[in-house]
Amino acid sequence: MAKAIPKKGSRGRIGSRKSTRKIPKGVIHIQASFNNTIVTVTDVRGRVVSWSSAGTSGFRGTKRGTPFAAQTAAGHAIRAVVDQGMQRAEVMIKGPGLGRDAALRAIRRSGILLTFVRDVTPMPHNGCRPPKKRRV
């Protein structure tokens, strides 16, 4: 089901490494489609610090669209930035997927203080014609 994350330093470089910068505040972007959920954590300037998706968390096929997969993906993305000292974050949620609420609940449980949660799902003002409805 879900992949286990290898422990830090299990296979690392010997010598100088790029220093990890402290990030007290950041922005968490959740893109929840019907097929997958992608969680990206950036600093306030928009540089990507960490990201994860249901696919990279070990889920394949239709399981990627489930709320549990979104919860796991959010946990993987958040774990890396909590180690870098992130305490506060803004959350931007985009898309109609099932993983919206599950990812948000996982972020709330991580201990990061959420300053605000904003829904940034693009809504057309009668733009392009939508695809035809499925007939199953």
From Swiss-Prot:
Gene that encodes the chain: rps11
One GO location term (cellular component): ribonucleoprotein complex
Listed GO MF terms: rRNA binding; structural constituent of ribosome
GO BP annotations listed: translation
Protein name listed in UniProt: Small ribosomal subunit protein uS11c
Species for this entry: Lactuca sativa
Recorded superkingdom: Eukaryota
Disordered as annotated region, ranges: 1-22
Alphabetical keyword list: Chloroplast, Plastid, Ribonucleoprotein, Ribosomal protein, RNA-binding, rRNA-binding
